[in-house]
């Protein structure tokens, strides 16, 4: 069997045996484009537990936004990790879209759960504010009285509704009394808290001749890039935990506690994990690592995106790459821009 075929087969087997959130595949599958118009497709979304299936049928008109949220979460993950050994690669020929990487309770798994949960809350909240779903809209729960010279107006985005959708849908399968479910619930909530803590006021001036006699203000979500940056910082400072078992009336329950007591206890906005990450230097179908061979590296950087670290000490190749680009652009009155086309040579460095 070819290496890629073996890799995909192993991915499929591992997701079937584990608790992989394979419903994330709805963001890249054929269901994504038609989910809102055909409610019966809820039953065809892979990996849904009964509670998620009921939620899908009850809120089918916002399910395209759920799919969109997963999609923007994946895209943001790939942006944030573009210069890392693990660059949030997805496997589009498998329902387990990240391969076996998320089978372990690592920092990477913590980040992916957080950014996906945040993406769902973000996309649903935005969709409601845009009026694309009849069951939701703008928020009427303003925080505080208007200040001097301004009043509440516009459409405050309803992050409480978006957060509820994310919580009810994403957390539905995380109800087992084991450590991994506890970790996933915590990191899902950290993603939602990232959105809620970054809500900010936007205001618009009203008055004669452009004056600002009065302002109307509303609550708005940040750009999702700010959420990605915030959660990436949380990834870098994630709290390592240990698993503890204790007996309750329902049986044995696993909980998490910080491994190191001299560090601060993680808050609901922090990411947590309890298993070490692989180094991702070499291809390994067991861990889901694709390795870093042929990855572009930054020869002038001493960081993780630099050739020394990204290439794991194997060295790198260099080549000259010619690119045709627009150049010497001139604005003409009125109103167009004319450009010439130039060939430029760039040095490209890739890992051996």
UniProtKB/Swiss-Prot annotation:
Residues the UniProt record annotates as site (Cleavage): 26-27
Tissues expressed in: Moderately expressed in placenta and at low levels in adult lung, spleen, and prostate.
Keyword Ion transport: no
Disulphide bond pairs: 77-88, 128-136, 138-155, 203-217, 205-212, 281-312, 297-307, 311-351, 327-342, 329-339, 334-335
Annotated lipid attachment (O-palmitoleoyl serine): 209
Alphabetized UniProt keyword annotations: Developmental protein, Disulfide bond, Extracellular matrix, Glycoprotein, Lipoprotein, Secreted, Signal, Wnt signaling pathway
Listed GO MF terms: co-receptor binding; cytokine activity; frizzled binding; identical protein binding; protein domain specific binding; receptor ligand activity; signaling receptor binding; transcription coactivator activity
GO cellular component, one term: presynapse
Keyword Disulfide bond belongs to the record: yes
UniProt xrefs under InterPro entries: Wnt (IPR005817), Wnt3 (IPR009141), Wnt_C (IPR043158), Wnt_CS (IPR018161)
PTM field: Palmitoleoylation by PORCN is required for efficient binding to frizzled receptors. Palmitoleoylation is required for proper trafficking to cell surface, vacuolar acidification is critical to release palmitoleoylated WNT3A from WLS in secretory vesicles. Depalmitoleoylated by NOTUM, leading to inhibit Wnt signaling pathway, possibly by promoting disulfide bond formation and oligomerization.
Biological process terms in GO annotation: axis elongation involved in somitogenesis; axon guidance; B cell proliferation; calcium ion transmembrane transport via low voltage-gated calcium channel; canonical Wnt signaling pathway; cardiac muscle cell fate commitment; cell fate commitment; cell proliferation in forebrain
Subunit structure: Forms a soluble 1:1 complex with AFM; this prevents oligomerization and is required for prolonged biological activity. The complex with AFM may represent the physiological form in body fluids. Homooligomer; disulfide-linked, leading to inactivation. Interacts with PORCN. Interacts with APCDD1 and WLS. Component of the Wnt-Fzd-LRP5-LRP6 signaling complex that contains a WNT protein, a FZD protein and LRP5 or LRP6. Interacts directly in the complex with LRP6. Interacts with glypican GPC3. Interacts with PKD1 (via extracellular domain). Interacts with FZD5.
Family (UniProt): Belongs to the Wnt family.
Protein name: Protein Wnt-3a
Name of the gene encoding the protein in the UniProt record: WNT3A
